[in-house]
C-alpha cells in the first residue's frame, strides 16, 4: 500500500509536466503555396513585419498568408534588375536587394525598385557588380 501511494504521488507529479511541454511547429512553404522557387537564398523581416525571401526565380514578400512575387520585367525599368536574388537586407525603412546583375533599393511608397549605380570620377555610371569585378 505504501508503494502504491508512492507510485501515485510520482505519477501525479510527472504527468502534468507533459501537458506543459512545448512542441515546435514548423510550416513548410513551397511553390504550391505561392513561393516563386523552392530554393531560398536569403530571408529577412522588414520594419513592417513582412518576410522577404530571395530565390533563384525572383523576390517574394510574405505577409503571413500570401506571397507577392517580384520578377524582372524587361519592359519595366522599375522592376527588379534580375530574378536570381542573392541577398535581401532590411535596414530601417529601406529594403536592399542584391541580385546577380546588380543592387536594387525597394521603394515601399512606389512599390518599385531602383538600380543602385556608382558614379565614377569620369561621370560614367557603373553597376555595383561591375565595380566589384573591376
Region annotations inferred by a language model:
Residues 1-134:
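Carboxylate-rich, polar loop motifs that coordinate divalent cations or form catalytic acidic clusters
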Amino acid at each position: 500500500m505504501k508503494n502504491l501511494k508512492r507510485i501515485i504521488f510520482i505519477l501525479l507529479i510527472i504527468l502534468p509536466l507533459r501537458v506543459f511541454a512545448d512542441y515546435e511547429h514548423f510550416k513548410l512553404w513551397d511553390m504550391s503555396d505561392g513561393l516563386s522557387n523552392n530554393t531560398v537564398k536569403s530571408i529577412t523581416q522588414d520594419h513592417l513585419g513582412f518576410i522577404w525571401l530571395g530565390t533563384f526565380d525572383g523576390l517574394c514578400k510574405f505577409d503571413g498568408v500570401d506571397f507577392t512575387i517580384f520578377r524582372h520585367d524587361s519592359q519595366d525599368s522599375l522592376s527588379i534588375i534580375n530574378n536570381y536574388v542573392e541577398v535581401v537586407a532590411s535596414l530601417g525603412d529601406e529594403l536592399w536587394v542584391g541580385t546577380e546583375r546588380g543592387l536594387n533599393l525597394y521603394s515601399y511608397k512606389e512599390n518599385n525598385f531602383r538600380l543602385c549605380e556608382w558614379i565614377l570620377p569620369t561621370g560614367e555610371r557603373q553597376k555595383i557588380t561591375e565595380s566589384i569585378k573591376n
